[in-house]
């Protein structure tokens, strides 16, 4: 990189314009060097060196070098000699005595010039005494001063500061260590104590650069080590750990450098908006989002390695240095292990290398003994070494297979062993397939965890089904799970359900075969292996059916029951499905989904018990609903004749698709109407099927569905289900299942306003124009190709249309308006949002009441794609 050294700038070059030009040349040279794969360490160090020269030249220009007893000092990251393109340049103007006013004015001009150059300068002007006083009270200041580096000015003044900072009285090593540990805990808590965040902060997230800094700060305070290399020389790190930390730091630096050259303002968050460009800069390429997912996989794996090293090394430091090697007395477990306090440790230094299967033994002891919380630091170091020296996966060792199955069958392994096995890399060392999903992310808003993290959370959710206290949240699973004969089959299905992701092809099919082979290899019977592999293959079946199919259609229930075949499979599947949803995204599970899955579960259970050769008698169900609804209405004072006259206007489908309580509720208000010409809008005061039911009764009008959903969308409510029905005499009986933005039923306090506005737009009779709103920030960075598919159905009267599109505001309203404009009748809708994707099902008929023709389907597809494309403002 050829550029002029700032020390050689003449006075004419020290104008804002000239200096900006020189800084731009330097920045562009660094950017080009980075894109040409120049080592990032050289670039980070050379940027700090360039700033050293520039600040030194300006210091001299302002005449500060002629003044005794003041120094210009780099602190913080700049003090370490590390600067990324947008890093803060933290400087300290240090003096022995308080500066006179005229000198402070001149220093202010110096700092203002740096700001005019658009440099992110953080500065302080302090005496040595002030630094000492503030540093003793403020951990951040103390840490920055520890990394102080003289740029120019008085060496003596700087050495006075160093004497203060290095003295034991400034921050005793143990006090500093405890404070930094607490600081790290608080920082990790801000990121939910996980390395897996969708838009991670490269610097501050657990496993990020700050975790490496914390190690260096602690070692510097205790040993005086000024680099990772010196830390290894003091024995704080082994050579292998030193190389690993350097490798991790190098990757994180490359990610941060790539991010900074894309930004105009300082930020360390790897947002969706910038993941694409960063991946490209780092050479990660692939079809679609493959490049991003590959880059983020490497990123998350690096965070895991740093987090593991950070935790282990700090504990070793605490045990060996702070506590002087004193430990609690050992309690012998067997010839291989002992317990010391709440930690398990190996009794032999090379146990895991000599007999790798004992790694699994250790976790069996953890599962057995509730007094053991984790692994001792020396044993963790031994485990890390053994893990890296394994020449084959653990599952290839017969003894290890036996112990793994012992763990899978152990009643305490779910909540005591598996999460720790994953965290310490043992699952990846056991299963080659698991090692492939570690850090595997999906570039979307639906999956908030990497595949491995999601799978472990799924196992943890399964464990919650064992406790009666969770019955209200998971009534079916808490009833079903305890009676499963072989819970280990469910756990194996959970481990394998997503194991095929990231390898191309259908992950369910990949996992199905690998799960079967694994089960046979581990001594399970063929029927057991078939059940596990079936669960893996169909782990999405129940969720998709409940949320995206009309589960009140007997045909849908029959088809689902045929795939499930028996109640045993149904019970395993419902537990896997619920745990899968809960482990995908903490915001996904709500009373609406619970109700849908419960209705599908019990409907299928009844179908299986009745026998699939004995379908539901539709007429009997209608009669049953009418009898119960009529009894409720008569209690309210209505005569049988009034009820009969009203029901003669309704079609049979109405009585089939509503419960008797819904029918009675609707009809009571219809019969009490003073003016049948006015619209009627009802909202259920109690949550119905997990949401708020909005019922609309009015004369049919053009684009009524679009009008209602547009009004609800305007109020930030989400329609999840709609049943669109008409009476024989031209009235609509439409039911919308609505949730608020948090997936809950609408607050009763809002009902009056919602009803008022809906009645107003319905009485107006004119279709509500779909108002476009700005696409939410997070959605702006995702592309979802609009797809319109027409699904096969046995019905000769109706068409099933599936729409996949970006979940843009107004999507449902514009879809409904398109149906109306083309003269198609909408009979039902199932609305599903999967992160940034809308996956909606609509039941349609033509203007004549029959199925859409192929030509009509083609026209509808083209029109919808066109109208949705114009939605975005």
Swiss-Prot record:
The keyword Lipid biosynthesis does not apply. Its EC number is 2.7.7.59, 3.1.4.-. Its cofactor is Mg(2+). Residues 693-773, 800-873 form the ACT domain. SUPFAM superfamilies: ACT-like, HD-domain/PDEase-like, Nucleotidyltransferase, Nucleotidyltransferase substrate binding subunit/domain. Residues 333-692 are annotated as: Uridylyl-removing. The keyword Magnesium applies. Uridylyltransferase (UTase) activity is inhibited by glutamine, while glutamine activates uridylyl-removing (UR) activity. It comes from the Bacteria. Keywords: Hydrolase, Magnesium, Multifunctional enzyme, Nucleotidyltransferase, Repeat, Transferase. Has four distinct domains: an N-terminal nucleotidyltransferase (NT) domain responsible for UTase activity, a central HD domain that encodes UR activity, and two C-terminal ACT domains that seem to have a role in glutamine sensing. HAMAP family: PII_uridylyl_transf. Belongs to the GlnD family. Modifies, by uridylylation and deuridylylation, the PII regulatory proteins (GlnB and homologs), in response to the nitrogen status of the cell that GlnD senses through the glutamine level. Under low glutamine levels, catalyzes the conversion of the PII proteins and UTP to PII-UMP and PPi, while under higher glutamine levels, GlnD hydrolyzes PII-UMP to PII and UMP (deuridylylation). Thus, controls uridylylation state and activity of the PII proteins, and plays an important role in the regulation of nitrogen assimilation and metabolism. This is Bifunctional uridylyltransferase/uridylyl-removing enzyme. It comes from Vibrio vulnificus (strain CMCP6).
